[in-house]
Amino acid sequence: MLQSMGDGEISISPYDTAWVALVEDDGGGRRQPQFPSSLEWISSNQLADGSWGDAGTFSIFDRILNTLACVVALRSWNIHPHKTDKGIWFMKKNMCRIDEENLEHMPIGFEVALPSLIDIAKKLEIDIPTQTRGLQEIYARREIKLKKIPRDIMHQVPTTLLHSLEGMAGLKWEKLLKLQSQDGSFLFSPSSTAFALQQTRDHGCLKYLTNHIHKFNGGVPNVYPVDLFEHLWAVDRLQRLGLSRYFQPEIEECIAYVHRQWTEKGICWARNSQVEDIDDTAMGFRLLRLHGYEVSADVFRHFKSDGGEFFCFKGQSTQAVTGMYNLYRASQLMFPGENILVDAARFSANFLQLKRANNDLLDKWIITKDLPGEVGYALDVPWYASLPRVETRFYLDQYGGDDDVWIGKTLYRMPYVNNNKYLELAKLDYNNCQALHQQEWQNIQKWYRSCSLGEFGMTERSLLQTYYVAAASVFEPEKSQERLAWAKTAILMETISSHFEFQQLSRDQKRAFITEFEHDSILKYTNGGRYKRRSSLVGTLVRTLNHLSLDILLAHGRDIHQPLKNAWCKWLNSWEEGGDAELLLRTLNLMSGGGRRRRWASEELLSSNPKHEQLLKATIGVCDKLRLFQRRKVQGGNGCMNATGITTVEIESEMRELVKLVVTRSSSEDLDSEIKQNFLTIARSFYYAAYCNQGTINFHIAKVLFEKVL
C-alpha cells in the first residue's frame, strides 16, 4: 500500500464532479458537455434516498451540497428527469435539517458554495426551500468570510478563496490566472478549476481536469492531489498504531518525499502550493524532526498573528481542533531556544484545554471515532512521558479505521490513511506482543520468588511496575532480551538499594557486599557464601549477569560479561549518587547488538565517540533530576506537576537538549540511530515515573499489560 503512493488515494466528490459536468464544450455546433463521463458518473451514483454524498456517513451539509450540485448538473443538460425529481424531493424534505447540524462539521467553503449553487438553481427554475433559519445563517457566514479577504486582496495574492471560486460573480480572471497553481488548477480544487475553465477556457485548467477525470473514471475528488497529506498522515497512523517497524523502508521514503517538498514557509496538502496551512506544516515538521531532518521552527512564524494567535489559514472563520492538536504535538519536539514553539505550545494547549472543558472537541476537518480521547491523551500525557505501548493501547481504541471520514468541500475518504486493514493488523500485533509480555511477566514472578527478592524489600507491586515500564518502552517481540535485561537490572537496582537503605547496613557491610560481588565466582554461590543473607543477594546478581551474558553469547557470539560487570561495579560504588540511568543505558546498549544495523560496537568504541558521551552525560543528568523529583513527590505527597506538564525549568530545558542530541544527525556521524534512541527511551521512562501519579500508572498497567484489544 505504501509503496504504491502517488498523488493520493481519495474518494470521489459528487459536488465537484457536478461542477465539472457543467462545463460546456466550446468546439462549436450544438451545445454539449465538455466531460460527458462526469454526467455518467452522476447518473450512476445517486443514493437510494435520492441524494448524492458519502454513503457511510450522513451529514446534512454534505448531502444537501452534493445533491443540489448534481440536480443542477442534470437539469442543466435536461437529462435523467426522474433522478432530478428524486433529488429535489430529498432537498425539500431535508433542507430544514440544516438548522440542526453542528456547525463545526460544515464543509470547507460551504458558506460560499451553497449560496452560489442556489443562485444557479433559481435560474434553472429548480424549486427548493430557501427561507430556513439555517440558510440565513449560512448567508451571514458568507458575508463574514468574503469581508475577511476583500476582493482586491484575493486578486493579488494566493488565498484559500482560490479553492472556492465556483459561482462567484465579478471576478477578474486576468488577475486570477496569475495565481493559478503549477498543475493548472486553482488551489487543487476541481470545482473551482471547472468554474475557471467555464469562464476563461484556459488550457491549464482543461489539462488539469482532463487528467483527473481520466484517472477517476468520470468523477473527481474534492481536492487533488493530496500527496503530502497522504504521505504524512499514513506514517502518523502507522506509528501511533505500533506498526511502523514493519514498514521502515517505506516510511523513510515517505518522509524523504515530504522533505523534498518542504519550504521555509511550510507546506499544505499538495506539493508546489502557493498557500500553506498549519496542520500539514505541523505534522510535517514533527515527522521530519523525528526522522532526523533539519527543519527550522521559524516556519511557524508564518502562522502567528500580530496579536499572538496561531492560525491555520489567513482569513479563516473558525479554528480547527485538529490543526491546534497537531501544532501542540509538533511543539513538544522543541529544541533549546525555540521560543516560537514555546508560544505555540502555550497557545495550542490553552485552546485545546478550553475546548475540552466546554465539551466542544468537534473538528471541522474530520469526523473520527474518538477525537476527545486523542486530544485528552495528548494533554494528559505529554510526549516526554508517553511510553510507546501506552500511546498505542489508547490509540487502538480511538482509531476508527474505515469509519473515519474527512471533511473538505464534501465528506471524503483517505483509504491509505484510514482503513480497517491497519486496524486489524495493529490489534493482532498488539495482542501477540501482550501475550508474550504476560508470559515474560509470569517468568519474572518465578524468578522473583526463586531469588527471595521480597526478603530484601522488593514488593510485588514494584516488581510489576518495573517490568511494565520496560515492556511499555521496549515492546517488540524480537527485543525480548533487551526488555528482560532492562527489567531485571531495574529490579535488582531497587532491591539492592532497598537492602542497603532499610536494613541500615554499615559502610563496612556495604563495602563487603561490593567486594564479594567484585570477586564473584558463580560456583561460590551454589551453597551460599560467608554471610548467607548478603551472599544470597550477591549470588542472585552474579547468576543474573551470567545468564544475560550467556544469552548474548549464544545469540550473537559476543561476550559482554566483563563490560556488564564493570557497569554494575560502577553503580554499586556510587549508588547513593544516582547512576541508575547509566547502568540501564549500558545494559541496554550491550544487549541490543549495536542498533538497527546490528553492527556491534564495543564499550571502548562507544566511549570514544563524542556524540555517545554527550548523550550519556545529558541522559544521566536529566534522569538523576527526574528521580530526585519523583522521590520528593513521594515523600512530600504533592506529586503533581502543573497543568502544562512542567517539573522544573531545568528539567524541561535538559529534556529539550537531549531530544536535540538524539534526533539531529550529521553526514559524518557513525553512531547508530537505534543506540541514540535508547538514551531518549530511558529518559522518557524516568519522566513518565516522575510525571504520572500512582493511580494513573496502575490504570495504565492494567490496560497495557492485561486488557486485550477486542
From Swiss-Prot:
Expressed in germinating seeds and leaves. Substrate binds at K145, K364. Pfam families: Terpene_synth. One of its GO terms (molecular function) is ent-copalyl diphosphate synthase activity. Mg(2+) binds at D277, D279. GO terms for cellular component: chloroplast. A motif (DXDD motif) lies at residues 277-280. Its EC number is 5.5.1.13. InterPro entries: Isoprenoid_synthase_dom_sf (IPR008949), Terpene_cyclase_plant_C1 (IPR044814), Terpene_synth_N (IPR001906), Terpene_synth_N_sf (IPR036965), Terpene_synthase-like (IPR050148), Terpenoid_cyclase/PrenylTrfase (IPR008930). Gene3D superfamilies: 1.50.10.160, Farnesyl Diphosphate Synthase (1.10.600.10), Terpene synthase, N-terminal domain (1.50.10.130). It catalyses: (2E,6E,10E)-geranylgeranyl diphosphate = ent-copalyl diphosphate. Pathway: Plant hormone biosynthesis; gibberellin biosynthesis; Secondary metabolite biosynthesis; terpenoid biosynthesis. Keywords: Isomerase, Magnesium, Metal-binding. The Asp-Xaa-Asp-Asp (DXDD) motif is important for the catalytic activity, presumably through binding to Mg(2+). Involved in the biosynthesis of ent-kaurene diterpenoids natural products such as oridonin, miltiradiene, eriocalyxin B and nezukol, known to exhibit antitumor, anti-inflammatory and antibacterial activities, and in the production of gibberellins phytohormones. Catalyzes the conversion of (2E,6E,10E)-geranylgeranyl diphosphate (GGPP) to ent-copalyl diphosphate (ent-CPP). Belongs to the terpene synthase family. Tpsc subfamily. This is Ent-copalyl diphosphate synthase 1. It comes from Isodon eriocalyx. The lineage of its organism: Eukaryota, Viridiplantae, Streptophyta, Embryophyta, Tracheophyta. The gene is CPS1.
